[in-house]
Amino acid sequence: MNLKFNTDYCIEEFLPTSIFSDLLNACDYYNLEKLISISESYVKQLNPFKEYIFFHEYYECFKWIYTYYSSFELPTLQSTEYIISLKNIINSNLYEVMMDLVFKKRTISGIYDFSYFDFKNSNSMINRGNHMMILYNQSKLSEMLDYCQDLEEEYSIKNNYIRLLDIYSLKGFAFSNTEKEKFEKLVSQINHTVEAHNSNIPKIKTSQLLKNIGLQAFRIDMYDIAINYFEQYIAMDSPYANIVGIDLCISYQKTNKINKLKSFIQSKEIYKGDGQYENLLNYFILKYKYQTDNDELSYFIVNKVPIIIDNTMGKYKQFFYEELSMLVEQTKRYKDLKTYLDSTSDMLPI
């Protein structure tokens, strides 16, 4: 794009320094109304000058901010390269807000090159939280927990309970199956914070928290906690309820809550999803549909379950392998699948 010089107007006339502090503060405290209001206002003001140097860069930034916080659409990967290049061109507080969007886009896209991000000592609370995620992805869990403790103290003092819950949500990833007491303590902290400050926490942040903690509880086999969080998440009418559907089915079965499982697989909303999701879900539907019909169940075991196992991974693969072993014994079809079971066991996660 060929940009022009403007000798009639100064960018500072349009953008007082205070506006960038307000913008960063709104980002840190997740004030959607203010983020949308500020960005929309400056998109309109800068639009007539968007073909001029400096005006163009600010116009594009405000447009990306407005687009993300009004419709949750992130910049393209190509745009993130451009945003990174603006470090010494645009206001530093605006750059912090933009780099949060860059971080979100690149991690969601599976790009884990963190050399562009210097968040550890950032003046932005949201980006210091992003530094926690970087430490997690680098498997620096001890350093992550130490850093987390500092953030917890700071965010509590500043009454930023939205970002405090973000920190708790990330902290859960650091705990393994052998640290269930620590995870239970974290869940207690989360419940206390949500109960005390629920009116100040946007629905979307509560929804994200319920999903993330539920998935973390499921990961370390704390199925009762997982069920509690998943059920609350689904009750909020989340458009992404199918994300936790299979995990909830497995959690119900692991805790022998079969009536709840049957009720869940009959609900309409669980059928939203891609082919892989529905394939996994059909296992539970068919298992309980055919539980009194040995011939049909045997056919399903022999012809369908191996396909499910071959097309899943990690915890799902382990679960369906165990299910197949159990169902084969129940229906006396072990001989038909002995070779398959033996070969598959080598591919299971340790």
Predicted regions and their residues:
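"A position-specific structural signal for the A-helix of alpha-solenoid helical repeats
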Residues: 59-64, 97, 101, 126-133, ...
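Structural motif corresponding to the intra-repeat A-B loop/turn of tetratricopeptide repeats
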Residues: 30, 105, 138, 177-178, ...
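Alpha-helical repeat scaffolds
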Residues: 35-42, 73-87, 109-120, 142-153, ...
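Canonical BTB/POZ domain core
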Residues: 1-41
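TPR/Sel1-like alpha-solenoid repeat signature
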Residues: 171, 210-217, 229, 248-252
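Residue at a conserved register position within TPR or TPR-like alpha-solenoid repeats
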Residues: 102, 135, 155, 168, ...
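C-terminal non-catalytic interaction modules
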Residues: 282, 287-289, 296-350
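Residues that mark the junctions of alpha-helical repeat units in TPR/alpha-solenoid scaffolds
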Residues: 16, 54, 58, 91, ...
